[in-house]
Amino acid sequence: MVGLGLLTLVLPRLAGQTPISKIAFGSCGHQDHPLPIFDRVVEHEPDLFIFLGDNIYGDTDDMEVLKAKYQMLGSKPTFQRLKAEVPILATWDDHDFGRNDAGRHYPYKAEAKEVFLDFFGEPMATTCKDHEGIYQSYYYPVNGNMLQVILLDNRTFRDKLQPYNGEVADQGRYFYDLDYAPYTSSDSTLLGETQWAWLKGELSKPADLRIIGSSTQFGIEFNGYEAWANFPHERQRFLDLIKETQANGVIFISGDVHYAEISKLEQEDLYPIYDVTASGLSSTWYFATPNQNRIEGPIMDNHFGLISIDWEQADPEVLMEIWDIHDNQRVEYRVHLSEIGFSEE
């Protein structure tokens, strides 16, 4: 277990509050919608809420338009209640970054970052101000354990996606048009070298549970849409980095797709990597793509994700849940920290 003296970076706004044991999260909420889901979130009394991207649908090169859309979100009574009662962290995806499926070539990414930080404020405004992009990490000591929250930036440094041209055998699984193909070479990047170097440093720090927020799905198989599967060498690099740093307790949370599911990645010499997707604060989609890594879901109704940790157990238990707009529990999956860590020799 990690002692409190090993790390001292604790969010000022959370100091003195109840230790973090319940984290809510979600993505894909349209500013034109009433967003009643935030009332459901608050009713569950989480210690933290994480926005995983598409927090608004900006889709503009005009920063005044982008600001106005954030202001529309900020004017929602349900958002105001969430902000007043629950500490917030946030990263972005393409629609709040600026353009659909955009990456590092988007010309207004610096301006969009400024608008993002102006809206969400602290602690992101301090954490992200001195480097390009909005990748960030936070540490919370809890009962002699350490919780680490890492939020990735999947937009600022990402190379262009490779258009799909029939590279993948259909086999009758794909009942829709595929947009993108996976790279077959390793000369492209999703995170960029600066973020990779930072990430290695973060994973090298001691923690018992690491919640890693990725705006796009990490754990799914290739589906022809945006995901880490389009950059298979980058996903493998991440898995190899977990092994290299012996980083225990990694669980991904993700968004983007307008439905919920849990995916499970298994690889030799590595504990199972879970990816809890919660992507439908107000947006919906009419189908879920094939995903042989799916172990729970899909849930197509509006929803949010919830991770609860029972730190009082000798082997703390992590509960992963999806709750829908009607306050129905739709997914329940449990693991102990001993199941998501490297065996001690």
Residues of each region from the PLM?
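Bacterial N-terminal signal peptides
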Residues: 2-10
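Metal-dependent phosphoester/phosphodiester hydrolase catalytic core
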Residues: 14-345
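N-terminal export leaders
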Residues: 1-2, 199
